[in-house]
Amino acid sequence: MIKSKISVAVLFLLCLCWLPTLSLAKGKSHFTVEDSQYGTRLVKWEGKDSVVDFNNIQELKDVKVIGEMAFEMNKYIKQVILPDNLQIIEKRAFNTFENLQTVKMPNTVRYIGNSAFNMDHQLELSVLPDSLQEIGEWTFWDCNKVCISVIPEHVSKIGRQAFTCCEGIKALVFKNQLEVINDRAFSGCKNLERIVFPNNLREISDFAFARCINLKGINLPASLQKIGYRAFGNCESLLFVKYNSNPKVDSSAFMNCPVSQEK
């Protein structure tokens, strides 16, 4: 009798271990979700749908986290509509898509992780969520159709190479309290023509805007303390730099730039 009770207890505990992760299916869509400290987390999507609307799938409408590599290297999806209360997109979640064209993000997303949309060459994205606080490293690296123009107000960190080679970006307005623009964050954005820097900016790091070949002039904020190695290197159209402070400027910060006027 005692052995029987122990066996039942063990079986019950084993069942509990499996509860956090649920494999679910709806039609031709296949996915796995689990509980996390932030709420429901999508672990993996294995469907072949061309359009994925989380809000139309009962089991996914309350997802708070898109997990690491959840959709990585998908070749079917063209459009994603993320759930209304999503908070976190983990690293490599939508990395290296062949056909992804549009992603609709709700104004609840706080964090987009490293390489989350890396090398999504067909992705056309013009607006980031107002709720966004942090953008990881290589997040939109080589997404040459991404054309955002405003960095949201609450973004406190932009990782290295976050927007490298985003050729669709023509203007950048930093509406935030960002203090550092990290290494190569916007390097190779060859159609970038205009930048409005944030008022609290302290540092423009190495190669941050290197090879932005259509950038013609910049007005640097009074808060700026440092301009790094080749920060504007090979900006071959850059003619005008206005200083409103006396930052420490690396001797190669403007290498191969035809800067003719500095104040």
Predicted regions and their residues:
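Bacterial N-terminal signal peptides that target proteins for export
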Residues: 1-11
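Structural signature of tandem-repeat unit edges
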Residues: 28-37, 47-65, 75-88, 98-111, ...
